[in-house]
Amino acid sequence: MAKFFEALDDKLIAFIEAQPMFFIASAVGEGRVNLSPKGLDAFRVLGPNLCAYLDITGSGNETAAHARGGGRATIMFCSFTRNPLVLRLYGRTRVGAPGSALWRRYAERFDALPGARQIVAFDIESCQTACGFGVPLMKLERTRTTLTELWAAKGEAATAEYRDKKNRVSIDGLPTGWGEA
């Protein structure tokens, strides 16, 4: 059933590229484990052991706080189609805000999206596939655009103000690095 791989191969990359969403879970030694769903065609495979996603401003910034505390994370893709499969990527995150070296290195790989807050790079240590037989069969209706429409309507100044209020510390009080030079 479950198989481990040291890196992504062409078949796994094709599977990732076909998925409309993914989940990222992260944690530090103490505090809550965070789990977030992500979409918006913002995930990119950059190499067999490297991927990244464009992170949009949201109500929290847990992954950034956890990246500062060691970066342990798992990214999961699962197929909701007739071809079941679950793919987990185990590794560590690094986060780069606009203007950072990480941002400059990878930003051109992403479409510009309103509210883009940071790029989360993920160094893959191992991959695991599982059957996915317990995952429900569902049909994608459409990608939600509410979040990017919200930030486009608010504009950059209001978005930056929101980040300063809501994204500087995690729900456990850990610094996220947002706003640091």
Identify the role of each PLM range.
Residues 1-181:
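Binding-site signature for planar aromatic cofactors or substrates
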